[in-house]
UniProtKB/Swiss-Prot annotation:
Lineage, broadest ranks: Eukaryota, Fungi, Dikarya, Ascomycota, Taphrinomycotina
Principal location class: membrane
GO molecular function: amino acid transmembrane transporter activity; gamma-aminobutyric acid transmembrane transporter activity
Family: Belongs to the amino acid-polyamine-organocation (APC) superfamily.
Organism domain of life: Eukaryota
Keyword Transmembrane annotated: yes
Official protein name in the record: Uncharacterized amino-acid permease C584.13
A single GO cellular-component term on record: fungal-type vacuole
Length: 544
């Protein structure tokens, strides 16, 4: 029976009840889910959460080693611009899918719907687990950076202080526990908290940019770097060509910009979701890309010595850069602002991760899913999922004791896992779904949809292997210098594949609908081009 056709066996009262639903609830019902959360996010507050997850200032500080250290200032200026054009293509394609299918399952749900007949469960399985790796490694990677910067402040005050791994671990754990408590609060409180978090992020970012421009040249006689130096002089600290080093530097851009999917996962808590959520996605990527480029310009024109910043014993390139440009008190002040932004960023990551985890638990992906999918009756938030992610994040932080190379792999995993998850449904949409089989939402790209999709997919196909390349090769590629991304990402994904073929393919049938077909909505609100069989799994949705 098609879910876009009315059933002759359906009582009129059922349709009357459904037509009385708010538009957002009706759209969600059309996708097979009943309303569980309170819709207290707007386009602005959804943007605030995703911009907090983006955390431009702490994200840049955390990934400066990749963005600047691989190829120097050219990677910061025109390299960032090149990467952002294609990152925006991915964001645009995601926004179009979000407008059509505004569920917290997001990319995972879209992959199940758009995959060819018989491949829906497998597509959803891989997309879901890859996206979960993005979400669950986000909070610990941010917490690790947060802890590192706090201890760097101690080192600035006392140069004889030596940071110990257990200190980083305990600070990171404390941060995630605090963020877990905040993320367990009601949606309305989260909206207010993240609004203020975004305001502070923007304010502190502006303060840092204005300050470094104002003080440039006061500590050293060089003043601003020349245009030729900034745009043309590579400082290649890899064993690869300048072009390859430039592509490898995109890892910092991709990781920094990987938070724009958050509005998709918050769409079930957003009013006017089919319009507000995709707008928030595009706003986050576009605004983040532009402001991030301006931040890069400020640093590129004021940095004194790229090589010294990357290789200083302090181990924090951004703080070393500030020390090159500013006096002690200003360096401490700007680093402190970055630490505060980092905490806000980690909290946004925790919220987004909990919503993704809930959507998967609702569909029975995890062991003990029925317990994980419990929504707190008082706060109307998935608090069990929040604390599961806190526990997993703490386990990820144990990599701190395995060495810097192991814990740093989390950053690369976030980039590559995000790209795989973000682009899989876009790939399916572009190559396997005809235009007349896909019902666009109110936000769409029109005739540019396919072109945008081709550009996004081509960029991802290029970047996925490059993100696995080590900085050095030959005898210089020691275990400590090795890029372990292929292991840290490939290992879990290999286990997921084995799990699929051994067991999951027998019981996982894709996203489970929590509302019956006859309880859905009238034909105008339903995703076209699919039909549903008698079981309640979207994996049985087929093209007409």
């Amino acid at each position: 029976m098609s879910i876009f056709k009315k059933s002759s066996n359906t009582a009129p009262s059922q349709h009357e009840d459904v037509e009385a639903l708010a538009s957002d609830e009706a759209d969600l019902a059309a996708l097979g889910y009943k309303q569980e959360f309170k819709r207290e996010f707007s386009a602005w507050t959804s943007f605030c959460v995703s911009f907090s997850v983006l955390g431009l200032l702490p994200s840049f500080a955390s990934t400066m080693y990749y963005t600047t250290g691989y190829a120097g200032t050219p990677a910061m200026v025109w390299g960032w611009l090149i990467a952002m054009v294609f990152v925006q293509c991915v964001a645009n394609g995601m926004a179009e899918l979000c407008s059509s299918m505004p569920t917290s399952g997001g990319l995972y749900y879209a992959a199940a719907v758009l995959a060819p007949k018989g491949w829906g469960p497998f597509a959803a399985w891989l997309t879901g687990w890859s996206n979960y790796l993005v979400q669950v490694t986000g909070p610990p990677s941010v917490a690790y950076s947060f802890a590192g910067m706090i201890l760097t402040l101690v080192q600035l005050h006392n140069p004889n202080f030596e940071t110990q791994n257990y200190q980083i671990f305990l600070l990171a754990v404390a941060a995630m526990i605090a963020q877990g408590f905040i993320s367990s609060m009601p949606t309305k409180v989260l909206a207010v908290f993240n609004t203020w978090g975004t305001v502070l992020n923007m304010l502190f970012l502006a303060i840092v940019m204005i300050t470094v421009l104002a003080v440039a040249g006061t500590k050293t006689p060089r003043g601003f770097n020349s245009n030729h130096k900034v745009w043309n002089e590579f400082d290649n600290q890899t064993d690869w060509s300048n072009g390859m080093a430039m592509l490898m530097s995109f890892a910092g851009v991709i990781w920094t910009m990987s938070g724009y999917d958050s509005p998709f996962h918050l769409s079930e808590e957003c009013s006017n979701a089919s319009v507000a959520a995709p707008r928030a996605i595009v706003m986050t990527s576009a605004f983040g890309g532009i402001v991030g480029w301006l931040l890069n310009l400020c640093i590129a024109y004021t940095i004194v010595d790229v090589n010294a910043a990357m290789n200083d014993d302090l181990g924090q390139p951004f703080v070393v850069y500030l020390r090159q440009v500013c006096n002690y008190k200003t360096t401490v002040a700007l680093t402190s602002l970055t630490v505060i932004c980092s905490f806000m960023m980690g909290q946004g990551c925790m919220v987004a991760a909990s919503r993704v985890t809930y959507s998967y638990a609702r569909d029975g992906v995890f062991p003990f899913s029925k317990y994980l999918a419990i929504v707190d009756k008082r706060t109307k938030t998935p608090n069990v999922c929040v604390w599961m992610n806190v526990v997993v994040g703490i386990l990820c932080c144990l990599l701190i004791f395995a060495g810097e190379a192991a814990i740093n792999a989390i950053f690369s995993v976030g980039a590559i896992a995000a790209f795989v998850a973000f682009t899989t449904p876009i790939f399916l949409r572009v190559f396997f779904v005809k235009e007349d089989e896909f019902k666009r939402g109110p936000w769409h790209l029109g005739k540019f949809s396919k072109i945008n999709g081709y550009a996004a997919c081509a960029f991802v196909l290029l970047m996925v292997p490059i993100l696995c390349f080590p900085q050095f090769r030959g005898k210089d590629n020691t275990p400590d210098a090795m890029n372990w991304t292929c292991v840290v990402f490939g290992g879990p994904m290999l286990m997921v594949l084995i799990w699929w073929f051994v067991s999951a393919r027998k019981w996982f049938k894709g996203p489970r609908l929590t509302i019956g077909v006859d309880d859905a909505v009238s034909e105008i609100n339903v995703l076209e081009g699919v039909t549903k069989s008698d079981d309640d799994s979207i994996s049985t949705l087929k093209k007409k």
